[in-house]
UniProtKB/Swiss-Prot annotation:
It catalyses: (6R)-10-formyltetrahydrofolate + 5-amino-1-(5-phospho-beta-D-ribosyl)imidazole-4-carboxamide = 5-formamido-1-(5-phospho-D-ribosyl)imidazole-4-carboxamide + (6S)-5,6,7,8-tetrahydrofolate; IMP + H2O = 5-formamido-1-(5-phospho-D-ribosyl)imidazole-4-carboxamide. GO terms for cellular component: cytosol. The IMP cyclohydrolase activity resides in the N-terminal region. The keyword Transferase applies. GO terms for biological process: 'de novo' IMP biosynthetic process. Transmembrane segments: none annotated. This is Bifunctional purine biosynthesis protein PurH. Keywords: Hydrolase, Multifunctional enzyme, Purine biosynthesis, Transferase. It holds the Pfam family AICARFT_IMPCHas. Residues 1-147 form the MGS-like domain. The lineage of its organism: Bacteria, Pseudomonadati, Pseudomonadota, Betaproteobacteria, Neisseriales.
Length: 526
């Protein structure tokens, strides 16, 4: 145990700092501080010694040099268990500093502001703070380093239970947290500066490249998993330090077994798909592919339509809703075997009802607009990085390329099918009618094979394709896919266009009296 007798507090984010400092003072801890933090403590009657008074050296260079002094860093880095360290510190009048409480200039918040000039960014790169954090973290055997306001209450509680001392285990945990903190901070600075053109001046907002020269990823482990995609693979789940709003990482598990690797991968696919719809929607996913999607007046109706698309594939799947789920919906869903149930919220009656299915994993995820900044795909020895596919085509962007003109209902169905196709593994073909998928063909090496599978799925489900529509995630390389679609009685097609055989494909649609629209963008998904 290390008794805390002297602390240095210098924080940018002052959340909770008064209460923490008062708690330290109540334990008889001498408090050193700088600038605005020292003023805040003094103004609120917390005993404090200015660092400049303690070191005998004034702050200078507009506050750039405050704590970079041997009396500060010697007091932090000195080892109490080495006689030569103790002797040298005594010789130079350097006292021990037992606790350092520091958080850093808000660099990321600064560069996130619209119009942030390079000069403003540079001025918000903390120097003294990280130096103290790293010094204290290195000497964790004798010094406690505090970088997170959330830790203040627990530390005061531990000191209260141990006559003002903190355990070795606590100090080590704080050290690990501190090094993670400075790594994330330096990573953000590196990402920013390596994306800025070297010849730009300090004034004005700099032009930044989308992809920095060096990409620093900061993630934190949520859990170790029993295994990965297969039982012989090891796995863990990590989330971003600051996950994008509305993403799966914000989930709250209400019940059920621990999420598996495949549960999380499939849940992400289901959630990303369902949250893209404005109307009440249900998405059922199996092996990261939608096997049923529908929009309707309410979640229960949407579920019934989505489930009807492919009752066989839905077995053991993931079911996601974009609206609060009630008891009636849970009762319907509970009639099938499922792995995970996801929604923004569940009524109390729904929670009570699903509790009987103890193995079902139930997740609440807030519906918010947001997407990951980057999508990452590992390849041998490297990483593919791209922006996410968040493009949703609008009615005004559609180009009718056939003699037949789509009706208003067909246009609505085409936009629905197109939105679904974005989440189906390529080659993707989606048949739909009335806000319901009627057949989904996924993941085939040839587009015509995906078309045939979608047709067979509709037939197996007993769903009529007469006057339904079809969506293709990429262009038709030949007319054969259109011919197969026509055989099903489908009346309209949506696809990107852009094939060297577009004219041949359009001619096939005209021969069959099918309306066809081009979107101008594709949705490959691998």
């Amino acid at each position: 145990m290390t008794k805390i007798e002297r602390a240095l507090i210098s924080v940018s984010d002052k959340t909770g700092i008064l209460e923490f400092a008062r708690g330290l003072a109540a334990h008889g801890v001498e408090i050193l501080s700088t600038g605005g933090t020292a003023k805040l403590l003094a103004d609120n009657n917390v005993p404090v010694i200015e660092v400049a008074d303690y070191t005998g050296f004034p702050e200078m260079l507009d506050g750039r040099v405050k704590t970079l002094h041997p009396k500060i860093h010697g007091g932090i880095l000195g080892r109490r268990d080495l006689p030569e360290h103790v002797a040298k510190m005594a010789e130079h009048g350097i006292g021990n500093i037992d606790l350092v409480c520091v958080n850093l200039y808000p660099f990321e918040a600064t560069i996130a502001k619209e119009g942030c000039a390079l000069e403003d960014a540079i001025e918000n790169i903390d120097i003294g703070g990280p130096t103290m954090v790293r010094s204290a973290a290195k000497n964790w055997a004798h010094v406690a380093i505090v970088t997170d306001a959330a830790d203040y209450p627990a530390l005061l509680e531990e000191m209260g239970a141990n006559a003002g001392a903190l355990s070795r285990a606590t100090r080590f945990d704080l050290s690990r947290k501190a090094f993670t903190h400075t790594a994330a901070y330096d990573g953000a600075i590196s990402n920013y500066l390596t994306a800025v053109q070297a010849d730009q001046g300090l004034a004005g907002e700099p032009v930044r490249t989308l992809f920095p020269t060096r990409l620093n990823l900061q993630v934190v482990k949520v859990q170790d998993m029993r295994y990965g995609e297969n039982p012989h693979q090891s796995a863990a789940f990590y989330r971003d330090l600051d996950p994008a709003p509305g993403t799966l990482a914000h989930y709250r598990q209400l019940q059920g077994k621990e999420l598996s690797y495949n549960n999380i991968a499939d849940s992400d696919a289901a959630w990303e798909a369902v949250k893209t719809f404005d109307d009440p929607a249900c998405v059922i996913v199996k092996h990261a592919n939608p096997c049923g999607v529908a929009v309707a007046a309410d979640p229960l109706s949407a579920y019934r339509l989505a489930f009807a698309t492919d009752t066989t594939s839905a077995f053991g799947g993931i079911i996601a809703f974009n609206r609060e789920v009630d008891a009636a919906t849970v009762e319907a869903v509970s009639a099938q075997f499922l792995e995970v149930l996801i929604a923004p919220a569940f009524t109390d009656d729904a929670k009570a009802l699903i509790a009987a299915k103890k193995n079902v994993r139930v997740l609440e995820v807030p519906v918010e607009a947001g997407a990951n900044r980057f999508e990452l795909k590992r390849v041998g020895g490297g990483l593919l990085v791209q922006t996410p596919d968040i493009k949703n085509v609008t009615l005004d962007e559609l180009k009718v390329v056939t003699k037949a003109q789509p009706t208003r209902q067909q246009l609505a169905d085409l936009l629905f099918a197109w939105r679904v196709a974005k989440f189906v593994k390529s080659n993707a073909i989606v048949f739909a009618a009335g806000g319901q998928t009627a057949g989904i063909g996924a993941g085939q090496m040839s587009r015509v094979d995906s078309t045939r599978i979608a047709a067979r799925k509709a037939q197996d489900a007993g769903l009529s394709l007469k006057n339904a529509v079809a969506a293709s995630d990429a262009f038709f390389p030949f007319r054969d896919g259109v011919d197969v679609i026509a055989e099903q009685g489908i009346s309209a097609i949506i696809q990107p266009g852009g094939s060297m055989r577009d004219e041949e494909v359009i001619k096939a649609a005209d021969e069959h009296g099918i309306a066809m629209v081009f979107t101008g963008n594709r949705h490959f998904r691998h």
